[in-house]
Amino acid sequence: MVSLKLQKRLAASILKCGKGRVWIDPNEIADVAMANSRDNVRRLIATGFIMRKPVVVHSRSRAREHNAAKRLGRHRGAGNRLGTREARLPSKILWIRRIRVLRRLLKKYREAKKIDKHSYRELYLKAKGNVFKNKRTLIEYIVKSKTEKLREKLIQDQAQARRNKNKSIKDRRAAKSAAKEIVSSN
């Protein structure tokens, strides 16, 4: 058997592919063996004695199917897991995700003037202290605290109005009694 290493290398260079993809016609080995220059190899390529093999298809259809099933929750059971829960998804990463969501929301609310800077700081520190499990609980807390503040303000206003009313009544009574004393002394 004649060595066709040189011809294969030259053909690979000309065809711009790897040596593994170069096909040499087994019936024309004698002619191919005689080709010892690039021009001769080009001639053999033109005649069809040397060809470039097509790329071997490595289908991803099975992998795609498997990934689609995984998205539906298949192949995720205890038997398919390697590594502890912490190794698979560290609690620190979960914390970072959660705190970033909460802080982004607080910042947005502060910029939209939904909360003032004092409540922002208070809620920021509460979020840092792991008070809020998720975004929804934080929003609920904000709404609840706002309604509570409004209620307290309303109660304070009513109490102040009551105090003012009582004071005015007291003043009127005092003025009346003072007027009576003046009349009785005359």
Swiss-Prot record:
What the entry lists under SUPFAM superfamilies is as follows: Ribosomal protein L19 (L19e)
NCBIfam families cross-referenced by the UniProt entry: PRK08570.1
What S-S linkages are listed for this chain? none
Annotated region described as Disordered, given as residue ranges: 158-186
One annotated GO molecular function is: RNA binding
Q: Which UniProt keywords apply?
A: Calmodulin-binding, Ribonucleoprotein, Ribosomal protein
Q: Which CDD domains match?
A: Ribosomal_L19e_E
Query: Source gene?
Result: rpl19
Q: What GO terms in the biological process aspect are recorded for it?
A: translation
Q: Which family does it belong to?
A: Belongs to the eukaryotic ribosomal protein eL19 family.
Q: Which PROSITE patterns match?
A: RIBOSOMAL_L19E (PS00526)
Protein name in the entry = Large ribosomal subunit protein eL19
| Gene3D superfamilies, alphabetized | 1.10.1200.240, 1.10.1650.10
Q: What does this protein do?
A: Ribosomal protein that binds calmodulin.
A GO CC term assigned to this protein in UniProt = cytosolic large ribosomal subunit
Superkingdom assignment: Eukaryota
